[in-house]
Amino acid sequence: MNRTFSLRRKVKKSEISTPSNFEHRIHAGFDARSGTYTGLPKQWQALLGPPRSISRPKPMVDPSCITPVDVAELKTVIRGPSSSFRYNSPLPFGMTNSPMPSVARSNSLRISATASPVVNVSSARHSFRPTLPPVSQRGYPFNDPSYAPLPLRNQKPPMSTTFGVEKPHQYQQIITIVAPSRTTTPQLQPKSPSTPQAMRQQPKCTEGVSDEEFRNALKFVVDGTDPRSDLTDYKQIGEGSTGVVEAAYKISTKQIVAVKRMNLRKQQRRELLFNEVSILRQYQHPNIVRFFSSHLVDDELWVVMEFMEGGSLTDIVTATRMTEPQIATISRQVLGALDFLHARKVIHRDIKSDSILLKRDGTVKLTDFGFCGQLSEEVPRRRSLVGTPYWTAAEVIAREPYDTRADIWSFGIMLIEMVEGEPPFFNDQPFQAMKRIRDEHEARFSRHAKVSVELSELLSHCIVKDVNKRWPAKDLLRHPFFAKAQHSSSIAPLLLQLQGNTINGNNPPTHHHSSQITTVIQ
């Protein structure tokens, strides 16, 4: 025994050599200015997802108060780096020999974050949830245990609402087939903060229609032709939770078009597909993005629309400084589209710079109609909480009945965007911003903003909590400020300046805020 121990003590440990031919290929760092990691391998960066500062706030739907006729769910705003959209070519004012001229993001051509940011909400808040499908099937923000709707003041039971229109249209009848109205709105009762386990135990709602029934209903609002024979040279320029967006060359008209491709079987709420298609199909206006056609291709819905090569207004407000004549020129066109919609009792409910697209000649057009609401004599106001928090009207956040003038509040916030580069309270988390919008005084231009008396007065007619004092779009168009408006071509220098920043490697600056999540509340 002793001999054995002595032998063990004499055994020499093998020496481990130092590393040889060592190469340090990864040099990770942290950029404090942008709040992002640098030098990470692509696989690691994919796990982290894109930084919050790249993503614009993304609409989300509050399930606690949904009018039965409203079909608005979580909408992914497709958005991406400006350098990825332009086919690596300059922005000419004339067509080139190539069938694919230089283009910028357009018509919801915005790439969304692959990993949705988490809304930071105190777990002490109560959660109000009606009978809805399990959160595991509904995705962000519903499967986030920290998510809860905004607490209300003097909450009253929601009124039951039925859908009615003055002049029924075919698409509205189809929507009734797909998403039949309930006679009463579910009563909302407070619950303790939900844990992931409790959320998984929620009862499951049965689907109203089968895949085949939905497909048959959708055939009433789409063209019966196959668009693939007339489209070529596809180039994916966007991707979101509803599908992908591609630029394509339309052979018959020899033009670039935007094609949204949405898989019917992968939609969290398929009936939402009716909303944008129906609005674009029915309403044509010089300042509304042009709709060409929609098609059922296998299990996908294809929507072919005008390609807006100038990009979104967001690119301009974050990268350039606009003059008041340029602000007036853009605002006049936006109000023209709103006046057209409001005269037809349509509420857009998501007015912001992301929803405003431009042509290369400076023409401004309104897009993103997935959250529209239709009013009628039977339903003169809506109650559903819909909108992007920083732009949402105070009465919408307070869940009071609202009408088309809710869009005017959002338009006023967009005026502040064009002057200051971002909406008020953008440093706050979405729900904190909503509380401030609801409880504090109306937002105004900052003291450092050098604006004219006319522009300040215009803003005061838009952002006012007394809805009766808020001017409609047709009255705003007659405001003295719009005497400064010029021809749409006056916007072209902004697009050239934006293009120059991209060519020189200076991408348009993004808002570096932790609250870079867009929150839309329905």
Curated annotation (Swiss-Prot):
Top-level division of the source organism's lineage? Eukaryota
Give a Gene Ontology cellular component term annotated to this protein.
cytoplasm
Q: What is the reported phenotype of gene knockout?
A: Low level of embryonic lethality (< 15 percent) which is suppressed by simultaneous RNAi-mediated knockdown of max-2. In pak-1 and pak-2 double mutants, defects in embryogenesis and L1 stage lethality. The few animals reaching adulthood are smaller but have normal ventral cord commissural motoneuron axonal guidance and are relatively coordinated.
Q: Which InterPro entries match?
A: CRIB_dom, CRIB_dom_sf, Kinase-like_dom_sf, PAK3-like, PAK_BD, Prot_kinase_dom, Protein_kinase_ATP_BS
List, in alphabetical order, the Gene Ontology terms for molecular function in this entry: ATP binding; metal ion binding; protein serine kinase activity; protein serine/threonine kinase activity
Supply the EC number(s): 2.7.11.1
- Looking at the record, the residues that make up the CRIB domain are 16-29
Pfam families membership:
PBD, Pkinase
Q: Is this entry keyworded Nucleotide-binding? A: yes
Q: Which residues form the active site?
A: D350
The reaction(s) this protein catalyses: L-seryl-[protein] + ATP = O-phospho-L-seryl-[protein] + ADP + H(+); L-threonyl-[protein] + ATP = O-phospho-L-threonyl-[protein] + ADP + H(+)
The free-text note explaining how the cofactor binds reads:
Divalent cations such as magnesium or manganese.
Q: Region Disordered: what ranges?
A: 183-208
User: Signal peptide: which range, if any?
Assistant: none
**CDD domains attached here?**
CRIB_PAK_like (cd01093)
Q: Which Gene3D superfamilies match?
A: CRIB domain, Phosphorylase Kinase, domain 1, Transferase(Phosphotransferase) domain 1
Which major enzyme category is it?
A: transferase
Q: In which tissues is it expressed?
A: Expressed in pharynx, vulva and spermatheca. Unlike other p21-activated kinases, expression is not detected in neurons.
Coiled coil start-end? none
Family per record? Belongs to the protein kinase superfamily. STE Ser/Thr protein kinase family. STE20 subfamily.
Q: What is this protein called?
A: Serine/threonine-protein kinase pak-2
